């Protein structure tokens, strides 16, 4: 009978290794603690793979808990070993987290198992394919003992994202954009839109824009406490990550805003918002260009603009 090949050791979240992945940092652990989650950190070691991992847990009721791993673990095995590795890791973690754990959800930051061309599934513009969920589940379970890995109904944080390479010059970055995008960035400047770095005192202004955006785009808004937790956590973990709060103004009017985080060499567009008024001022374009320039001055190599729908699908939570 095969035995578990993965060893895990609990550790303090403050001692998580430096990483470019915001959601695997001491800062993010503190954010989630303030929002009511429990956090757990572990070192892990398997055959040829070691690292650490931040896990979030929450009570679901009736003595049942769920665990969530956002963009982790960072270090993983060869793609053919994804399933057995996750099975072993999960079984080892349950012994420490508790047997009342209903499931562990992983949003994996690893390379897709479906890179390259093929005939199975849908062919995407970048040449990669992703079969239907049932076939993805079958592939992930190859080599596992229990066949207990399930494909989540929706990919959340990493399956499809827009990531910009910041190693290019500003001229090269602008040159790689669609003509309409370049035009709107410059139009915002000509119309007098100014982007400034702000502070927590103007967070209520941003939240008002955020509520307008959620109503306009029909998504569920996070509570105000979510945003204030970012700043409270930053004060507790000043050396872990950075938070930058950008507002686009035209005169006295605030037209758009963004919260940008920096972890390691990666900047992440965490939240954005824009006014339902004066949309012809193109303030969101000015915000994104300011965020790109800020990330470059901070030495970042990539700018993660966040998750997007994998294809035009009005039902997908990241469409639009």
How would you label these PLM feature ranges?
Residues 63-154, 264-320:
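Acyl-donor binding region in acyl/amide transferases
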Residues 2-63, 111-113, 118, 130-133, ...:
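A conserved beta-strand-loop-helix scaffold within acyl/acetyltransferase catalytic domains
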């Amino acid at each position: 009978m095969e035995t578990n090949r993965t060893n895990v050791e609990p550790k303090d979240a403050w001692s998580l290794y430096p990483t470019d992945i915001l959601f695997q940092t001491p800062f993010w652990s503190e954010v989630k603690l303030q929002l009511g989650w429990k956090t757990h950190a572990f070192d892990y070691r398997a055959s040829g793979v070691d690292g650490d991992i931040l896990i979030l847990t929450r009570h679901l009721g009736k003595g049942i808990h769920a665990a969530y791993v956002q963009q982790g673990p960072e270090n993983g095995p060869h793609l053919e070993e994804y399933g057995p590795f996750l099975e072993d890791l999960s079984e080892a973690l349950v012994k420490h987290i508790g047997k009342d754990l209903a499931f562990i959800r992983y949003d994996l930051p690893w390379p897709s198992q479906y890179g390259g061309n093929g005939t199975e599934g849908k062919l995407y513009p970048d040449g990669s394919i992703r079969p239907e969920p049932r076939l993805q589940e079958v592939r992930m379970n190859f080599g596992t003992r229990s066949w207990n890995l399930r494909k989540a109904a929706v990919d959340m944080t990493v399956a499809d994202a827009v990531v910009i390479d910041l190693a290019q010059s500003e001229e090269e970055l602008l040159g790689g954009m669609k003509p309409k995008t370049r035009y709107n960035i410059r139009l915002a400047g000509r119309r007098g839109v100014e982007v400034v770095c702000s502070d927590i005192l103007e967070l209520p202004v941003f939240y008002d824009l955020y509520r307008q955006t959620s109503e306009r785009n029909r998504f569920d808004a996070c509570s105000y406490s979510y945003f204030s937790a970012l700043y409270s956590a930053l004060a507790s973990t000043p050396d872990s990550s950075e938070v930058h709060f950008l507002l686009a103004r035209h005169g006295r009017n605030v037209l758009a805003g963004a919260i940008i985080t920096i972890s390691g060499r990666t900047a992440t567009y965490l939240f954005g918002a824009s006014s339902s008024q004066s949309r012809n001022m193109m303030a969101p374009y000015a915000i994104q260009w300011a965020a790109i320039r800020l990330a470059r001055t901070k030495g970042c190599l990539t700018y993660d603009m966040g998750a997007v729908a994998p294809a035009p699908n009005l039902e997908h939570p990241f469409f639009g």
